[in-house]
Regions:
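Helix-boundary and loop/linker segments of multi-pass membrane transporters
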Residues: 6-12, 69-71, 93-96
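Generic alpha-helical structural element
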Residues: 18, 22, 26, 67, ...
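Membrane-proximal soluble regions of multi-pass membrane proteins
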Residues: 36-93
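Generic, low-specificity signal for short hydrophobic/alpha-helical stretches with a mild N-terminal bias
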Residues: 2, 15, 60, 84-88, ...
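Long, highly hydrophobic alpha-helical transmembrane signal-anchor segments
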Residues: 1-39
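Pore domain of cation channels
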Residues: 72-127
Length: 127
């Protein structure tokens, strides 16, 4: 009996680590998408080719609190992706365009599904 429980523990740990890796990949991939597509990508943002942003960062709402030439970097999009995947909703960055809203909705659905499937699988292994 003890060997069976130990075998299940090992399987469960592997499942949880794999699920965590999948979830982290989800966060990184969506961060890259947000970074690459917002206002035409990093090069277009640097050259101010597109005036209307797809995302409203808190720094844009309070320009007196940041440098006058502040632009979002990859870390800002990574934070957006992480908070969207954990809270399943916008936190301090608001989507302004339809594609941004749909992409954030897709990320939340993928994240929720991943977490639900990993938990369901772990519970099933323990039975």
């Amino acid at each position: 009996m003890r060997e069976t429980i130990q075998a299940h523990k090992g399987k469960t740990q592997i499942e949880m680590i794999t699920g965590g890796a999948i979830w982290l990949t989800n966060v990184i991939v969506f961060a890259l998408w947000y970074w690459e597509v917002d206002r035409g990508g990093p090069a277009a943002r640097a050259n101010a080719r597109k005036t209307h942003p797809d995302f409203l960062f808190a720094q844009m709402s309070s320009p007196e609190l940041v440098d006058k030439d502040w632009e979002p970097t990859f870390v800002d999009y990574l934070f957006l992706s992480f908070t969207n995947a954990t809270a399943f909703s916008p936190t301090d960055v608001l989507p302004l365009t339809r594609w941004a809203k749909l992409t954030m909705m897709l990320q939340s659905a993928v994240s929720l599904s991943t977490v639900a499937l990993v938990i369901a699988r772990a519970v099933n292994i323990l039975r």
